[in-house]
């Protein structure tokens, strides 16, 4: 069910020593009623045409949208997904770079990590024009993220804006903003599982969650030391020599 939702503001964190996230420029925000679509024309078999509006500044090249079971790059060869909504080895994985050029790989292995996190291995590295997303560097307390804005994606290749409601040791949950000023929000439903959510840090998308539950959305929190430890071990099991990239919030 669609509903107008507009976020209070986007936030950028300035360093790991900052006590509070700082407000980002309004240039980071979509216009009221602006289309949430990432693609103007999407193609599984060929190149795509990207939207020319605000969503063009959000680098979604590291997200594979060719199936509802979305995959998100965390190394040049590893992708994460919802464990309860996995793709299978042998499946084709299609990305589109920021110019809309199609890039294909094959999924050759998938293993569960912890909770609702699974990691997959591609048959070869992706090129540097695809985005590999950083995860939040662990910190003692993430509670200051509560009330800030996250970019939340869905199965129909769109970007929405929800507030962070809570951050636990291994999970994070979102809510719809009470005050609507920018962009759209949506109630997440069946089929949205595994789609990623991001926090904006110094103009970069940092992966914080993949959907497990609907409504405002909730799922595993990728700033969790436990999840990062288990994920790193699984990455090494599938193909050694790759490391997660972490970014301080």
Residue ranges and their predicted role:
Residues 75-76, 80-115, 125-127:
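Catalytic-histidine neighborhood of serine endopeptidases
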Residues 44, 53, 62, 66, ...:
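A structural motif
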Residues 20, 25-51, 71-86, 171, ...:
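C-terminal subregion of chymotrypsin/trypsin-like serine protease catalytic domains
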Residues 94-98, 153, 198-200:
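A generic structural motif
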Residues 22, 117-192, 200, 211-233:
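Chymotrypsin/trypsin-fold serine protease catalytic domain
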Residues 4-12:
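Sec-dependent N-terminal signal peptides
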């Amino acid at each position: 069910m669609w509903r107008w939702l507009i976020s209070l503001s986007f936030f950028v964190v300035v360093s790991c020593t900052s006590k509070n996230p700082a407000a980002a420029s309004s240039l980071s925000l979509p216009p009221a009623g602006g289309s949430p679509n990432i693609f103007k024309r999407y193609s599984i078999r060929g190149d795509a045409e990207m939207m020319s509006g605000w969503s063009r500044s959000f680098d979604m090249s590291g997200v594979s949208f060719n199936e509802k079971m979305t995959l998100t790059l965390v190394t040049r060869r590893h992708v994460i997904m919802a464990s309860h909504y996995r793709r299978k080895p042998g499946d084709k994985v299609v990305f589109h770079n920021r110019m809309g050029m199609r890039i294909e790989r094959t999924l050759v292995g998938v293993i569960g990590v912890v909770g609702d996190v699974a990691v997959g291995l591609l048959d070869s590295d992706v090129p540097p024009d695809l985005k590999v997303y950083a995860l939040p560097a662990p910190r003692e307390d993430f509670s200051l993220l509560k009330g800030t804005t996250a970019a939340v994606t869905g199965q129909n290749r769109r970007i929405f804006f929800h507030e962070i409601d809570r951050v636990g040791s291994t999970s994070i949950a979102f809510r719809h903003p009470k005050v609507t000023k920018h962009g759209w929000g949506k109630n997440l439903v069946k089929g949205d599982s595994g789609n990623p959510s991001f926090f904006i840090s110094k103009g970069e998308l940092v992966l914080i969650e993949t959907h497990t539950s609907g409504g405002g959305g909730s799922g595993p929190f990728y700033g969790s030391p436990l999840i990062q430890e288990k994920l790193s071990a699984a990455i090494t099991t599938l193909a050694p020599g790759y490391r997660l990239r972490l970014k301080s919030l």
